[in-house]
Amino acid sequence: MPSFLLFGVFPFLVFLQRKQYVMKNILTDIRLFLILTVLLVSAHCFSQSVATSNTEMSGIKFRKCSYEFSSNEFSKKIDFTLPLPSENAVLQTICDALLMGEYDNSTLEQDLKNELSSYISDKKEDAVKADDYNETSWSIAPVFVGGGYIAFVSSFSQKFASEEAPAPMWGDKCAVFSLTTGKRISEDEIFDKVAEHNYIVARKMYSTLCKILKKEDDGDSVDVSFLFNDNFYFTAKELIYKYGSFEMYHTSGVTELSLPKKWLKPYLNVDGPLYKYWFGEKK
């Protein structure tokens, strides 16, 4: 073999092969970089959008709308699961009561998109949190459907970064509605009017509270009526009361108390919605 082939062409071919290998790796790295960039951008866009999904509970169709936003000025989280907009005026009335005029269920998804878009467009890139920085969260979800009733728990929280700001607020607001009228069921409707019976129920709840806290039951020397706060819902088996930040001093951090159906029977209004749902018409 001529020497010029040995010392000229072969090295050149090796050089070309190595160059192709390097170029191939570079192109592979570029492709990986582009893929990762697309994934990151997609994830960011998804996190900055309103997520929606549909579900069904006991024959009622619901739509879940949620988003999370955070900036140096504030953060906000919304998570609503409400009946789908329909011609059913009763469900619309219930949604109006739950949203308290802040949003319209018939245009909820678009309203949340508009709200989030305005937050994004006004977002500042300053990494230092503002002096009045605050975090808010609001969720609404159904917890029970049955017997012609639907129950929701609306959870809200707000806290501030500044030590001089108001104390954090949080709590669960419960509501039970009639699926026939859309009317919210009140505490006065479910219990009878006998004062002694009302005291027995409150005293029972306080005893339950003491058991949870593993403390001595001092209910005979305490005004236990504070446990009636009209913040309740019921299921097929029990009555549940909820307590929030304004009641923590009295409940020592306990947020929920419940009483069983069987125990409550003697103290319910026999003409009220809960008695009729649990035990039928009294004969």
Each model region followed by its residue ranges:
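Short hydrophobic targeting helices and cationic amphipathic motifs
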Residues: 5, 13-16
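Low-complexity, intrinsically disordered or signal/transmembrane-proximal segments
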Residues: 17-21
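Bacterial N-terminal signal peptides that target proteins for export
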Residues: 24-34
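Bacterial N-terminal signal peptides
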Residues: 33-42
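Compositionally biased intrinsically disordered regions enriched in Thr/Gly
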Residues: 48-283
